Amino acid sequence: MEQITKPHCGARLDRLPDCRWHSSMFAIVAFGLLVCWSNAVGGLILAQLKALGWTDNSTTATFSAITTAGMFLGALVGGIIGDKTGRRNAFILYEAIHIASMVVGAFSPNMDFLIACRFVMGVGLGALLVTLFAGFTEYMPGRNRGTWSSRVSFIGNWSYPLCSLIAMGLTPLISAEWNWRVQLLIPAILSLIATALAWRYFPESPRW
């Protein structure tokens, strides 16, 4: 009786030469990492909130700590949910959570509401980072997976200087009341573009 040979997707992916498809996956993930800078912008918007009298030492510490707590939780559950739903679905889900919390947070009426939104942002961001790296490395061949991961991390780390430059440009142009709100809306809009690209071009991981 003839045996049916099961496909070995991982081995086939590893045998693929570097090609345009790998570059496309790199571009989508790198852009997604670059623009999800809700964490990077935290200190910048705190400066504006302090000028408005929204925050003191206690609320500043809470604002920062609650974001980190959310990221811890997101990192913990993000991979688990991604294992059950798939990398692509998890990518889009966590982007949606992250974007929605940034938009809602941008229209916060007070500091307590904003802090609550920051927790949700942290959850979405923590889960998103886990899923992006997990999905990306599953596409890349084993022979140079570390190289591809270094490249995508390099692009993602530019989010910190980029959002700082944007904040510098905004400060003389708009009031503090709108400055911090716009600084949350910009990454939300850019992340929406990243989500649309993922929806259109990001396939499910064959390894999953």
Over which residues does each language-model region extend?
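Transmembrane-helix signature of 12-pass secondary carriers
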Residues: 1-208
